[in-house]
């Protein structure tokens, strides 16, 4: 009977912990994007959802892209990350490595394991620049719209980055709206809207995703090493694209 009571108490404690409420206005911690059934193998580094039609400009850019793996894989792939160019945002968010949110007085820092990148999200009330010089990770501002929902708006992204590994393009005038709603202590519901009239005929509403807290995790130094990428491409990726049209991803 005593053993049964102990087990029952532990089970109830675990359940209570899982249902712990979200702290107010706090995203701090290491988070991992959860898998989604709706995401195909080819789309694992993309926003997913219903991809809108490309404009003529967008289609021309898309046709120039040569992915390193997937259905469109071909020898001579020109995915920028194959030579260790920055992955860019939002693609890095969908890469299967965690990231950490840290909050300081006038910014939220989003620190990614991939390339050990730090993204700054300003929370001091400033407006986005109207005509910014493009950057790999753009310019971002954020605000709390209620006690559990943080909204980020951003623009000024370098158009050399791709929206996923299959080569979907974007322009320098792309604007993003991200919503991070912390629904309980361990869970964030994430939504993304991409607005880029130069590349797409209507806004791209990304597939809603879930982020889970990883309380014991630490962000490692996951740098892209050019010599390792080149060796992997020569030994595995290029032969895979040539033989099957589906070069493996590293």
What are these regions (language model features)?
Residues 1-4:
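Positively charged n-region of N-terminal signal peptides that target proteins for export
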Residues 13-15:
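N-terminal signal peptide c-region/cleavage motif recognized by signal peptidases
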Residues 18-250:
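PEST-like low-complexity, intrinsically disordered acidic/proline/serine-rich tracts
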């Amino acid at each position: 009977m005593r053993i049964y009571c102990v087990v029952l108490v532990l089970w109830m404690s675990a359940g209570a912990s899982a249902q712990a409420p979200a702290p107010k206005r706090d995203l701090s911690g290491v988070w991992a994007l959860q898998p989604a059934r709706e995401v195909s193998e080819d789309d694992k580094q993309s926003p997913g959802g219903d991809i809108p039609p490309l404009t003529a400009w967008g289609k021309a850019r898309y046709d120039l892209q040569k992915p390193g793996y997937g259905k469109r894989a071909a020898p001579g792939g020109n995915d920028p990350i194959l030579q260790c160019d920055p992955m860019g945002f939002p693609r890095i968010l969908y890469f299967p490595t965690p990231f950490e949110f840290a909050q300081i007085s006038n910014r939220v820092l989003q620190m990614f394991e991939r390339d050990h990148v730090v993204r700054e999200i300003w929370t001091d009330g400033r407006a986005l620049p109207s005509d910014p010089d493009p950057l790999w990770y753009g310019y971002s501002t954020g605000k709390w719209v209620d006690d559990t929902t943080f909204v980020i708006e951003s623009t000024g992204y370098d158009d050399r980055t791709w929206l996923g590994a299959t080569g979907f393009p974007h322009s320098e005038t792309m604007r993003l709206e991200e919503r991070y709603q912390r629904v309980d202590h361990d869970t964030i519901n994430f939504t993304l809207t991409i607005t880029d009239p130069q590349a797409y005929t209507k806004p791209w509403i990304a597939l809603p995703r879930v982020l889970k807290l990883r309380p014991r995790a630490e962000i490692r130094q996951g740098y892209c090493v050019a010599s390792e990428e080149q060796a992997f491409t020569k030994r595995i990726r290029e032969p895979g694209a040539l033989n099957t049209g589906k070069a493996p991803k590293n």
